[in-house]
Amino acid sequence: GIELGLQKHLGTRYETLIEKYPFDFVIGSMHLVCGEDPYTGKVFEELGDAQVYRRMFCETLECIRKIKCFDVLGHLDYVVRYGKHQAEAYSYEKFSDEIDMILRELISSGKGLELNMAGIKYGLGFAHPHPSVLRRYKELGGEIITVGSDAHKAEHIGYEFEIAGELLKSCGFRYYTE
């Protein structure tokens, strides 16, 4: 498989890549907002956390409407990890319109959502996306979930996978395969 860092202007390149190399599984992840990776902090120098989060959700929606050659959306609320105030400026309720549009687009396109445990690893206090988003995805009819650890080091492979099943069950998912 492969992870694509979704950027709407690269849609044709992604399609060509996937046609040439028909991977079994493709994660389409959002790493950029306003052309910057939130990891660098630059985007938060000019905009407040809530503005950046909203912008990220809007850009995510644009990307998934344009790019279809992926199976699962990764890093839905990754941006929160790097905000100046992180989760203080974030909740499903604050961004429900934008998040619901993303979730509905995924569901109607037959695409899934990644549960990324790295939010816990980085001290955010929750996995990505937030459990309230997972519950909403399920309420809207979403069924496809993958679990990832966002491991950039060998020791982080499978990080907190032992709690992923219970987390998913608490959000309304009945089946989980390890």
Indicate residue ranges for each PLM-predicted region.
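Extended substrate/RNA-proximal surfaces in nucleic-acid metabolism proteins
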Residues: 1-108
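Charged catalytic cores and adjacent phosphate/nucleic-acid-binding surfaces used
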Residues: 34, 86-178
